[in-house]
Amino acid sequence: MVALPEILAFNAQIHSSFPAGPVALFVGATSGIGAATLKAFAKYTVKPKAYFVGRSQEAADAIIAECQTLNTEGEYIFIAADVSLIKVVDEVCAQIQAREPYLNILFLSQGVARFDRPVTAENIHLVAALAHYSRIRFITRLLPLLQAAQGHRRVVTVGGGGFEGPLDTSDFQALHIPLEKLRGHLITLITLGLETVAKSAPEVSFIHDYPGAVDTPLTRTVLSVMNEGAAIDGGSVPDLITAEESGERHVYLLTSPRYPAAEGVDDKASLGGQSEVILGTDGKVGSGVYSIGFEGENATPETLDFLVGLRREGMVERVWKHTEDEFVRITGERA
């Protein structure tokens, strides 16, 4: 367990230990976890350049003003976009590619609490579009920029790391999966998608994390649908943590050497008194793809064994083929 005091102590020294001038993209960052993480990133880093994507210009203006107060040397650029649409994701990525030769950090937290299974204009289940398809598209489109960065290269996708569940291969989009199985299905899609991407980018580290129950509009909507105190994952609803604490925890995930890339110098530096490097999703230390829980630790042995079984069944390849087929259907281009 990485306790909050340890996280805060680590974050306090980012300004002196983390390279100055990091370039980052935060998707889904005009509210909730994304906004809190962007602000914490502005607070701790030196001369950051942070792009952030969302739908509300009003919210973005307030966030930019707050970030500029936190760090006057930073640059904060808002891109208004509906990233549930794959074609729009491509447009956003094209803007970043036109402006930047490299990217150090990609942070993905876009999501929506909808249980009526709406579909997008591109005929993808809205919840799945935000949780899986658009995130994988951002990663694959921006992977060359991440690989071009010197030193630190990391992707963090906020979801349900450690809670991977069975896949329904007849319903990858999760349009008809029972509600109680929906979460585990989508979480597995994300993790297996990251494993595929990582094979072609061993110099980039990939984290799929579970943020805990964070006090955000999305969380409150979910809890309200579940009748304010219904069981989640077989247990009682935990106390909500603040968005500010979540921001601190996620900046730690963005910068800590506990989660190194599989190859290269990336984060193989000294841990400086921190907890040790954790296990990747393949059960090996520091292997580059991490499914981690709220406490910053790797998934349980049972979950890692479950992922082994999925690999044996060829699920990594099946998830990727389905995802690429959807991209081709929508854009004419593979991931």
Residue ranges and their predicted role:
Residues 1-79, 95, 170-335:
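NAD(P)H-dependent oxidoreductase Rossmann-fold/reductase module
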Residues 27, 100-111, 156-159, 207-211:
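Rossmann-fold scaffold of SDR-type NAD(P)-dependent oxidoreductases
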Residues 71-77, 94-108, 114-119:
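A glycine-rich helix->loop->beta "capping" turn
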Residues 80-91:
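The beta1-alpha1 cofactor-binding region of Rossmann-like NAD(H)/NADP(H)-dependent oxidoreductases
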Residues 84, 126-134, 185:
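Glycine-rich NAD(P)-binding loop of the Rossmann-fold in SDR/ketoreductase-type enzymes
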Residues 103, 146-167, 202-204:
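Active-site loop of short-chain dehydrogenase/reductase
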Residues 113-131, 174-176:
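Short alpha-helical oligomerization interface
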Residues 132-150, 195-199:
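Amphipathic alpha-helical dimer-interface segment in Rossmann-like NAD(P)H-dependent oxidoreductases
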